[in-house]
Regions:
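Phosphate/nucleotide-binding beta-alpha loop and adjacent structural elements of enzyme active sites
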Residues: 1-217
């Protein structure tokens, strides 16, 4: 879920007025709509209906948690969109532990934390596109919500990241070295910070987090 609120004005979820001072969706406020979306960290697929309104079936989701994948895949596939059960990372084909807080299943992370452990398999986004014969040029919005693994996800995309016009990325530890590294990586790839969402405090680790919106220069 984007912390900027709904993407589509008619979504039944409250859009809110904190981020842009109105109750319109994100794309309305950007005066822009995507032709295709790559969404990493699907969870409950709340966004699938909104993406379908703008770009039909041309959206791809990744979900690392196999239980969430099975539970919510129909929410995505009903629109003809694709979903894959992999953990996006900077190395292919590793078996890694995914830590799942029992009371915050939407906060599952490859970074060690309290919670139940399930095993998941990694893939770089570049390899996913090669193996599935997907074309980066068909997607211009990247949405990343991976609870602390955002830098590794970006590294796994490589130079293909310049195909995206906008990147929405949740930064889960504001003020940290991690936040600095993510920002430096994106600016080195030709993006600039367009806007931050309102800040929130995590109920899992107590750290401040927000969504950041980057735009290709």
């Amino acid at each position: 879920m984007s912390l900027f609120g709904a993407f589509w004005d008619l979504d039944p979820n409250p859009v809110g007025t904190d981020n842009f001072g109105n109750n319109k969706g994100l794309f309305y406020n950007l005066e822009w709509t995507p032709k295709g979306v790559l969404h990493i960290g699907a969870w409950d697929a709340w966004e699938a209906k909104q993406y379908a309104h703008y770009c039909g079936s041309n959206s791809i989701f990744l979900e690392a948690n196999p239980n969430s994948y099975l539970r919510f895949k129909n929410e995505i596939e009903q629109f003809g969109q694709k979903i894959y059960n992999f953990a996006a990372w900077n190395v292919d084909d590793l078996e890694m532990k995914l830590y799942c807080p029992p009371y915050n299943p939407d906060s599952s992370s490859l970074l060690e934390q309290n919670g139940d452990v399930v095993m998941t398999k990694t893939i770089t986004i570049k390899s996913l596109f090669e193996r599935e014969k997907l074309n980066f040029s068909n997607y211009d919005l990247l949405n990343i919500d991976t609870e602390g693994a955002e830098l590794q996800v970006l590294e796994g995309i490589g130079d293909e990241i310049r195909n995206f016009t906008y990147i929405i990325i949740e930064v889960s530890d504001l003020g940290s070295e991690f936040e600095t590294k993510v920002h430096e990586y994106l600016t080195n790839q030709g993006f600039y910070l367009y806007k931050e969402s309102t800040h929130h405090r995590s109920s899992v680790n107590g750290k401040m987090f927000c969504d950041k919106l980057y735009k290709l220069i």
